[in-house]
A protein has these predicted regions:
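Extended hydrophobic leader/signal-anchor segments used for secretion and membrane insertion
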Residues: 1-473
Length: 473
């Protein structure tokens, strides 16, 4: 029997190991993000070799129920040996509709359906903005913004200076508008929002693939945009506005704007006839004083308009009546270039006065959700949650998760589930790929026709070699 300090040390060592195991099993555990599905919130970039590490507190759900927009680590029900990290988008009992980059709660049926956008809390919204300008220009290592990233009207009225632009109104209207022809305009690009050293290899890989887009993952224009700048004026303007123009086929053209006139601001929506205001907020105070730089920002996000001055929110205005729910998808014939009948154009406009200087120009876009293969109306069963990755273009999540059950006999030959020879039902994740492509690490089942074999990973992570040929299922 051990006595003295050796025994005490062994006891202490044993208790420490037991405590560590219990802590890891029940309380807290560290994970490395393996994939890109939650980027850029949580990095798991193979292209840039960047993998965030997170600390998961397992006891949180003991004290409170999961909430919408929570980031959650969970065991994938169809492959329980894998931990997934996603964001909770749908709650038990929800009826969801995904369109135009937003997620909606649906009430009613048919023509009586009512859509209510699910808005992110302000602090989360701030974190999920993805910078487009100057990030895209810097990613391409370009030094100038005119005329490729921005266009100007009239062109002679706008000059590019170090750190910004000048607009000469000469008593008329001049405006600067975002076009970014190199990356297709205000489109949901997978590399938006990343640091340049991460975005560049991601974009280069896409270019190497010819900017091909999975047919189940269409690119879309992004109507939810925030733009801002520091405005310096030499003398009083008749009007200065930050505007977002949205054009979609078979839908009315909308221009959302934060306009400043005579020391007053207003949030407004105009249609194809810009002389007609479809809706507007109450006026609010906002000053543009000659010789005093002022930071202004404006966003159209989650069917509301928001204005800020020097970081302080001035006004919000509900714009659900003039929604961009439909018409955002880009045809597959040319998925990298937004056609002329589908575009989102952030604009900086000024009328009257003299020279206007814009610095710290910035354009961000919102997190853009796409439906992909999910049904039009998504019914979330009671006791279940609808999970999506922040990087919707590279996320395998609730939109595409599908279970498959295969029957086998005692020799692992595939047989119909209702066959008397069926002695076992194997359940797992259905993530089959094109047989001509390279296998994916999570691909299952994998068919090997020349060997009369199907490789399948069951729900417990066991790799099984089944005998049979691929069929319609």
């Amino acid at each position: 029997i051990l006595v003295g300090p050796i025994r005490h040390n062994l006891e202490a060592f044993g208790v420490a190991i037991l405590a560590a195991v219990l802590l890891k099993w029940f309380c807290i555990e560290a994970y490395q993000i393996p994939t890109s599905s939650m980027q850029p919130t949580l990095m798991g970039s193979v292209e840039a070799n960047v993998h965030d590490r997170i600390l998961v507190i397992k006891l949180i759900q003991t004290f409170r129920d999961p909430k919408r927009w929570d980031i959650t680590v969970f065991k994938y029900p169809l492959q329980k040996n894998q931990n997934y990290v996603k964001r909770i988008v749908g709650m038990p009992g929800d009826r969801l509709y995904i369109s135009g980059g937003n997620v909606y709660q649906v009430e009613g049926d048919g023509e009586n359906r009512k859509f209510t956008v699910l808005r992110k809390p302000d602090d989360l919204q701030e974190e999920t903005w993805k910078n487009v300008y100057p990030q895209r220009r810097n990613t391409r290592a370009e030094t100038k913004s005119l005329p490729q990233v921005f266009g100007a009207s009239p062109s002679r009225a706008v000059d590019e200076i170090e750190g910004g632009f000048t607009l000469e109104t000469n008593g008329k209207t001049a405006f600067l508008y975002f076009r970014d022809e190199a990356d297709g305009g205000m489109v949901d690009r997978v590399w938006d929002g990343y640091p340049v050293d991460v975005a560049r290899p991601m974009r280069e890989q896409e270019a190497g693939n010819g900017f091909l887009v999975n047919q189940n993952r269409p690119q879309e224009i992004v109507p939810d945009v925030r733009l801002g700048c520091v405005v310096s004026i030499e003398k009083a303007l008749k009007e200065f506005s930050l505007a977002i123009e949205v054009v979609r086929p078979e839908h009315e053209k909308y221009t959302y704007a934060f306009a400043v006139r005579g020391g007053k601001g207003v949030l407004e929506v105009r249609g194809a006839d810009k002389s007609i205001v479809l809706g507007k907020s109450d006026e609010f105070d906002v000053a543009l004083t000659p010789g005093t730089p002022t930071q202004l920002s404006f966003a159209h996000v989650d069917e509301q308009l928001i204005a800020w001055q020097d970081g302080t929110e001035l006004q919000r205005f509900e714009s659900a009546q003039w929604s961009c729910r439909e018409g955002c998808a880009i045809p597959f014939s040319n998925p990298f270039t937004a056609p002329s009948d589908r575009k989102v154009s952030p604009q900086f406009r000024c009328t009257g006065g003299g020279k206007v200087t814009l610095t710290e120009v910035r354009i961000d876009r919102d997190q853009h959700y796409t439906r992909e293969t999910a049904p039009e109306i998504i019914d979330v069963p009671e006791g279940h949650y609808y999970m999506m990755g922040d990087n919707t273009l590279q996320s395998i999540d609730s939109r595409g998760w599908t279970a498959i059950t295969i029957g086998v006999d005692k020799d692992l030959n595939i047989v119909p589930l209702d066959s008397p020879d069926c002695v076992r039902q194997i359940r797992g994740n259905k993530r089959a790929m094109d047989l001509s492509g390279a296998p994916d690490r999570d691909e299952t089942p994998i068919a090997l026709p020349d060997q009369n074999t199907i490789i399948m990973i069951d729900e417990f992570g066991e790799i099984l070699r089944l005998k049979g040929q691929p069929g319609s299922n």
